[in-house]
Swiss-Prot record:
Gene for this chain: psbK
Keywords: Membrane, Photosynthesis, Photosystem II, Reaction center, Thylakoid, Transmembrane, Transmembrane helix
UniProt-annotated location(s): Cellular thylakoid membrane
Disulfide bonds: none
Main function: One of the components of the core complex of photosystem II (PSII). PSII is a light-driven water:plastoquinone oxidoreductase that uses light energy to abstract electrons from H(2)O, generating O(2) and a proton gradient subsequently used for ATP formation. It consists of a core antenna complex that captures photons, and an electron transfer chain that converts photonic excitation into a charge separation.
Prodomain positions: 1-10
Pfam family of the protein (one): PsbK
Membrane topology designation: Single-pass membrane protein
Protein name, UniProt field: Photosystem II reaction center protein K
GO cellular component, one term: photosystem II reaction center
TM ranges: 26-46
InterPro entries named among the record's database cross-references: PSII_PsbK, PSII_PsbK_sf
Length: 47
């Protein structure tokens, strides 16, 4: 059981290489929301 589990874990990163560009962008999403809130507040005059 253990060797099978380790083998599966070793193969998962290779299987997800297709999604590497998306994963690189994911940490920026909260920053985009922060920027959106700032622009929105600037548009309404920081009420």
């Amino acid at each position: 059981m253990a060797p099978l589990t380790l083998d599966l874990l070793a193969q998962l990163p290779e299987a997800y290489q297709l999604y590497a560009p998306t994963v690189d962008v994911l940490p920026l999403i909260p920053l985009l929301f922060f920027l959106l809130v700032f622009v929105w507040q600037a548009a309404v005059g920081f009420r």
